[in-house]
Curated annotation (Swiss-Prot):
Gene name linked to the record: glyA
Family of this protein: Belongs to the SHMT family.
Organism per entry: Sphingopyxis alaskensis (strain DSM 13593 / LMG 18877 / RB2256)
Record-given protein name: Serine hydroxymethyltransferase
Subunit structure: Homodimer.
Domain of life from the UniProt record: Bacteria
Site positions per UniProt: Plays an important role in substrate specificity: H241
Function, in words: Catalyzes the reversible interconversion of serine and glycine with tetrahydrofolate (THF) serving as the one-carbon carrier. This reaction serves as the major source of one-carbon groups required for the biosynthesis of purines, thymidylate, methionine, and other important biomolecules. Also exhibits THF-independent aldolase activity toward beta-hydroxyamino acids, producing glycine and aldehydes, via a retro-aldol mechanism.
Pfam families assigned to the protein according to its UniProt record, in alphabetical order: SHMT (PF00464)
Family annotation (PROSITE patterns): SHMT
């Protein structure tokens, strides 16, 4: 086999100058379609938000090129001084934001953060106690299909049938019966505030550690609009997007130095290799934004808007799980209307409103169908919608749901077209990413 000697440097024309529109028109076209979707659809998915241009710029920065295994000042690669600077900024801002002693900003996601806590503080086969999916919990809290449900003896608690609030009598009974190593508070579709003090008392009673997953409401805590779990939990996990308005990623917080050391070892080298420095840079930017006074206004408005949306839907005849919301999300039980979550979220998307089908407490339908939808206010609040706009959105959603009730699973094309027009007009009044 002959090897030809190359006497010229290898460099692709345009490699450092051409943008994606030139290099890959197919991807560029998809990016354009996604931008238009975000600009002209109303986003009600409670776990989604709209980041600032500054966060986008940081995430698309040259930090994507850098490997930085380890932690600030203790890296396994050279050339990490700028990475140290930006990660330390993220850590310090997170500690200030949540008034805590230790922060690990390296988890790639909320699921990775939860997995790292379990790796650090439990062993495979240990008992964990978390909220069941149908009560509003999350996959990573011990659901059977997830790693947490396969590698651990996962026991699940639920909510009361009469008011859909956490059944603390059940939590206490299960904790005393099973003696879990870890109790998990938090969820992905629970609209009320959690009694962190009660969870901690139960954990202390059985010698368990308490983990609070505040992925959904972290931004509300940061903005002072929601109680903080930091004084009660041994460890707190969160995502950095959702109500926190940062890039998609995870984070772990604690006030316990010994736990912090175990968490750091569990994240790296236990669960992950190199951190995503471009994402950590974007986290630092988002945390800096959340430290500004106006973020407190955002957090308060997010809750007020969610309540306005839930109240309008309730006035239009919808059944609101737990009677309303204290947070950024509401869960709508569609069984009184005789329609499914799948039919509802598909009809709403045809109407230029995105939400997600979601199980409701004691749901008889499978997760691919569900008896409910979950709606949220974070993205709409970010683009400037207020109470009046969310009340109007409530009417739009109710019009589509009423059409499904009256016309069947395919809905009413005329109603959906009318709502699309109203959505477009509203979005044009509150533009995003212009120029």
């Amino acid at each position: 086999m002959t090897t030809e000697t190359l006497d010229k440097p290898i460099k692709s024309a345009g490699y450092f100058t051409d943008g994606v529109a030139i290099v890959d028109p197919a991807v560029a076209a998809a990016m354009t379609r996604e931008l238009e979707r975000e600009q002209y659809q109303i986003e009600l998915i409670a776990s989604e938000n709209i980041v600032s241009r500054a966060v986008l710029e940081a995430q698309g920065s040259v930090f994507t090129n850098k490997y930085a295994e380890g932690y600030p000042g203790r890296r396994y690669y050279q050339g990490c001084a700028p990475s140290d600077e930006v990660e330390q900024l993220a850590i310090d801002r997170a500690k200030q934001l949540f008034d805590c002693g230790y922060a690990n900003v390296q988890p790639h996601s909320g699921a990775q953060a939860n997995g790292a806590v379990m790796l650090a503080l439990t062993k495979p086969g240990a008992t964990i106690l978390g909220m069941s999916l149908d009560a509003g919990g999350h996959l990573t809290h011990g659901a059977p299909p997830a790693m947490s449900g396969k590698w651990f003896n996962a026991v699940q608690y639920g909510v009361r049938a009469d008011d859909h609030l956490v059944d603390f009598d059940q939590v206490e009974a299960l904790a005393r019966e099973h003696r879990p190593a870890l109790i998990i508070a938090g969820g992905s579709a629970y609209p009320r505030t959690l009694d962190f003090a009660r969870f901690r008392a139960i954990a202390d009673d059985v010698g368990a550690l308490l983990m609070v997953d505040m992925a959904h409401f972290a931004g509300l805590v940061a903005g002072g609009a929601h109680p903080s779990p930091m004084q009660y939990a041994h460890v707190v996990t969160t995502t950095t997007h959702k109500t926190l308005r940062g890039p998609r990623g995870g984070m772990i917080l604690t006030n316990d130095e010994a736990i912090a050391k175990r968490i750091n070892s569990a994240v790296f080298p236990g669960l992950q290799g190199g951190p995503l420095m471009h994402v950590i840079a974007a986290k630092a930017v988002a945390f800096g934004e959340a430290l500004r006074p106006e973020f407190k206004d955002y957090a308060k408005a997010t809750i007020a808007n969610a309540q306005a949306l839930a109240n309008r839907l309730k006035a239009r005849g919808a059944d609101i799980v737990a009677g309303g919301t204290d947070t950024h999300l509401a869960l709508i039980d569609l069984r009184p209307l005789g329609i499914t979550g799948r039919d509802a979220d598909e009809a709403l998307e045809r109407s230029a409103i995105t939400c997600n089908k979601n199980g409701v407490p004691f749901d008889p339908l499978p997760p691919v169908k569900t008896s409910g939808i979950r709606v949220g206010s974070p993205a709409g609040t970010t683009r400037g919608f207020g109470i009046a706009e969310f009340e109007a959105i409530g009417d739009m959603v109710a019009d589509v749901l009423d059409a499904l009730r009256d016309k069947g699973e395919h809905g009413d094309a005329d109603v959906e077209a009318d709502v699309r027009g109203r959505v477009r007009a509203l979005c044009e009044r509150f533009p995003i990413y212009q120029g």
